[in-house]
From Swiss-Prot:
Subcellular location: Cell membrane
Originating species: Bacillus subtilis (strain 168)
Primary subcellular site in the record, as a coarse category: membrane
Highest classification ranks of the organism: Bacteria, Bacillati, Bacillota, Bacilli, Bacillales
Membrane topology: Multi-pass membrane protein
Transmembrane helix recorded as keyword: yes
Family to which this protein belongs: Belongs to the UPF0716 (FxsA) family.
Pfam hit, one: FxsA
Recorded superkingdom: Bacteria
GO CC term, one of those recorded: plasma membrane
Protein name: UPF0716 protein YtzA
Keywords: Cell membrane, Membrane, Transmembrane, Transmembrane helix
Spans through the membrane: 3-22, 26-46, 70-90, 93-115
Database matches in InterPro entries: FxsA (IPR007313)
């Protein structure tokens, strides 16, 4: 319940505050253009990296390897691309962290921990 409160009340309020602060600091037009630009860059980066991960999954499957790492990368890239396309600066920062391979390495253990927790609650099954 606390997570939903943060997601739907606190997070948008912080995003609006940052938007208003930057609008006053650099102007409304540059702020809006920056948000549009990050959305376009996010979509392009997610498409490029997503295609690379798709081919890596296929290659791993051809060699009989489990593509777990590539699938985790693909999930991070998908979520990162979505976050970059959403308007807001915190969501852009989180999306960029998921798209940059160096910082994605920090996020994947959190993703695996969350997935393992869901599998223990019988919400998903990991084989």
């Amino acid at each position: 319940m606390r997570f939903l409160f943060l997601l739907f009340i606190v997070f948008p309020a912080i995003e609006i505050g940052i938007f208003l602060f930057l609008g006053n600091l650099i102007g409304i037009l540059p702020t809006v253009l920056f948000m549009i630009l990050t959305g376009i860059i996010g979509a392009a980066a997610a498409k490029k990296q997503g295609t690379e991960v798709y081919y890596k999954v296929q290659r791993d499957l051809q060699y009989g390897k489990m593509p777990g790492e590539a699938i985790a990368d693909g999930l991070c890239i998908f979520i990162g691309g979505l976050l970059l396309m959403l308007p807001g600066f915190l969501s852009d920062l989180a999306g960029a962290c998921l798209l940059i391979p160096f910082t994605r390495g920090w996020c994947k253990p959190i993703l695996f921990k969350w997935l393992r927790g869901m599998s223990k609650n019988k919400r998903i099954i990991i084989k």
